[in-house]
Amino acid sequence: MTSINRRDLLAAGAAGGLAAYAPGALAQGRTVNLKFGNAGNPQTISNRFNVKLWEEVAKRTNNGIKVEIFAGTLGGEQRLLEGMALGTIDVYNGAYTGTREFDIFYSPGFFRDGAHAKRVIQGPIGARASEVLEKRYQARLLGIGRLGPWVLSTKKKISSLDEIRGMKLRAPQIEGMVEALKHLGANPTPIAFNEIYLALQNGTVDGFVSALNPSVAGKFFEVSKYVLSNPFGEGLDKEAISTRAWRRLSDSQQRVVLQTFEELEATEYFQAGINAITTDLNTWRQANGADSVVTIDQQDIVRRMEPLNKRLADEVYGPGTWDTIRSL
């Protein structure tokens, strides 16, 4: 994939701004049609949530907002996010942002759990990350979908993190996860989500790191036998809308979108992700045998990762940030 440079993004954003509607300028009763993109297939929690979200938004706005869902058909996350600035899609959902402010959140052990992540992101740290996202991509953050745990999967069985040293492991192009794998002695290999299956199948990598639920939906267990049951980071999907599309909505429509996301995220995203863990791991066992789901010492993961997490937090957000995060 050819990367889009910042000049292209800014130019596209400026052009889009000239054509955008001012807030509330839409004629009463007119339907705003939007395109949504996510790299996973329709069976993932992320995409099932978005079907429910936008159906509910349509009801609450009397069909004033209608969103067409494109799940796993428009490319990887980087292409989708950049596509928002270019106008090819209007709403993006995914892990990737290419911003340090969000990307360091993906290092294993950075958050204790999804509830802790929400407390941090709802405060000043999350507000700063959102501002960076808006400036870079001309996009407004609608909310964070807590997807549940990320996991580490390997073709070869491991019993501790020492054994991933030297392994080529697929990682998203996300700093927190790339740095984490380096920190543990592995060789991170950035590969788009929609290319993971083939990379495992043809031997490009020895395993991968990704969110558990989309990995099961993508049947990655067919090409990577073992998976750690331990959380290896938190899945935090950004739901963002282009500022161009956001301006097409009236003030009341904007409030409906934000309120509906907040209401549904707790049950249809966060709790759904927690509920799916047992089912997803059982699917892995059924495909590869009872010993294919491996559990290691979780506190060992946290201890190993703390020096890196402290460095990243204090480097990106300023001295003392890691202590603040731990106190929340």
Predicted regions located by residue number:
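A gly/proline- and charged-residue-enriched helix-loop-helix capping module
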Residues: A117-A127
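N-terminal secretory/targeting leader peptides
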Residues: T2-I4, D8-A20, G24-H116, E134-L328
